[in-house]
């Protein structure tokens, strides 16, 4: 069984795959100061409740866009599971070309989404990830990663609106039935929701125009189903896309070997 860890700016997702299916997924808020022992106690309790023996986990892979969290996640794998984790990075064997000026600067989550989306849906395609940032990643028909777009995330935009305008409250995100709001909060909700639907539709159209052909569109991230309700341009939503990318990456790359000194506490 493989321990798969997807560390984002907002949440860290832990999952276990037994070679045929996901046995469980668990989510915790990202905190760069949380120690490996805190992760270990929390995770082993959840594994036990799911009937998963920690000793049966024989591999680990980590994808993170939070460098400060990597140290403790690596120590978790070493100290609690006696494993040296594979760390997702551009230099690994992805099975596709990365056609970027500086591949090393690309967030691992974007490459992982591209890997899983092309494997599951074929190309050419656009992967949209509704996270802290809203990213659009483009994969051609041969599976090569050819670039993308980064826009502010929905929650980030909501918070910025509240912080910058003293009289605008902090609001929840939902789909308004009407575009024209009759008071402040409905007007804000409409601007956020339908504004992001418009951003999605507009960027898909512009990406396809640049690419020169229609493309499949796959969305992931917590808000993907909600945004997909408002547009026909999102063809599939896949909540486990990044986890699946990590699983596939681990299949393509040999597991690192845990050296004795790495198993000791630093």
UniProtKB/Swiss-Prot annotation:
Catalytic activity: (R)-pantothenate + ATP = (R)-4'-phosphopantothenate + ADP + H(+)
Cofactor note: A monovalent cation. Ammonium or potassium.
Compartments in which it is found: Cytoplasm
Pathway membership: Cofactor biosynthesis; coenzyme A biosynthesis; CoA from (R)-pantothenate: step 1/5
The keyword Cytoplasm is assigned to this record: yes
One Gene Ontology cellular component annotation held by this UniProt entry: cytoplasm
Signal peptide coordinates: none
GO BP: any one term: coenzyme A biosynthetic process
Sites where the protein binds substrate: 107-110, 184
Binding site for K(+): 129
InterPro entries: ATPase_NBD, Type_III_PanK
Assembly behavior: Homodimer.
The protein's name: Type III pantothenate kinase
Organism: Acidiphilium cryptum (strain JF-5)
């Amino acid at each position: 069984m493989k321990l798969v860890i997807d560390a984002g700016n907002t949440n860290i997702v832990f999952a276990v795959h037994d070679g045929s299916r996901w046995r469980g997924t668990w989510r915790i808020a990202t905190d760069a100061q949380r120690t490996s022992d805190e992760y270990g106690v929390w995770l082993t309790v959840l594994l036990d409740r799911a009937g998963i023996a920690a000793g049966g986990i024989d591999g680990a892979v980590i994808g993170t866009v939070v460098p400060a969290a990597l140290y403790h996640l690596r120590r978790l794998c070493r100290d609690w599971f006696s494993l040296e984790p594979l760390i997702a990075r551009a230099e690994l064997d992805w099975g596709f070309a990365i056609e970027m000026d500086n591949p090393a600067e690309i967030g691992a989550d974007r490459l992982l989404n591209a890997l899983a989306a092309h494997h599951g849906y074929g190309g050419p395609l656009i992967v949209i990830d509704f996270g802290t940032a809203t990213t659009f990643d483009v994969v051609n028909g041969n599976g090569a990663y050819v670039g993308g777009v980064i826009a502010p995330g929905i929650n980030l935009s909501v918070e910025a609106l509240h912080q910058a305008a003293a009289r605008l409250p902090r609001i929840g995100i939902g789909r308004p039935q009407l575009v024209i709001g009759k008071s402040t909060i409905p007007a804000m909700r409409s601007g956020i929701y339908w504004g992001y639907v418009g951003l999605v539709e507009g960027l898909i159209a512009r990406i396809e125009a640049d690419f020169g052909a229609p493309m499949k569109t796959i969305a992931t991230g917590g808000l993907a189903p909600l945004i997909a309700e408002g547009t026909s341009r999102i063809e599939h939503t896949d909540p486990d896309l990044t986890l699946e990318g990590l699983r596939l990456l681990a299949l393509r790359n040999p597991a690192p070997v845990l050296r004795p000194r790495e198993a000791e506490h630093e």
